[in-house]
Amino acid sequence: ESRGLGDVYKRQTYKCCHGFKEYWNFNGDCLRYFTANKYHYRRELRYVLYKYENYLRAKARQPLLSPDECTNVFRDVSVSNTLDHITPQTPDFVEYSEEFCNEYLNNIGNLSLLTWGNNSAKKNHNPANDGVVEMYNSIFYSHKEIYETLKSEKKWNEIQISERRDRIVAFIKDNWLD
């Protein structure tokens, strides 16, 4: 067996991507961590959404958000971002199925960073309603993405959540796992 530097590099790269133990697989575990419904209040998720916002800004050749703008180090509630459910947790327009609650409600595809004021103003209304849709027509590029979907498809359900999740997961893979 060759023990050259290239071989050592390949083995270490493999271990970094696939884990040092069978049960510790960075590719699988990392993706499950950010796509599983039970982790939706984790700080790391806010970080991923912040990085996704800056990824979209960079693609559009726009200035990036600073961490301070996103984490609100100045404790100014008016500019603080909160983790928002695009379709609300307790809607006033529909009753969710058990499957929807388990698979989609807290999915990363249904979560966005939103200011406290807008999150509060949305209440529990349908995100496809005109007044709510307009809240996503903002300076944030991740919101523009949601806004365009809501305007063109006039709904936010399993399909839109899955499509958004897939875009964010692709971003995670491209930036941290490959």
How does the language model describe each region?
Residues 1-2, 76-79, 150-155:
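Short, exposed beta-strand "edge-strand" segments with a Pro/Gly-rich flavor and a Y/T-containing core
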Residues 1-9:
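Single conserved hydrophobic/aromatic residue that forms the stacking wall/gate
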Residues 13-146:
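Betabetaalpha-Me/HNH-type nuclease active-site subdomain
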Residues 131-178:
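In a subset of proteins, long, contiguous C-terminal domains/tails are tracked
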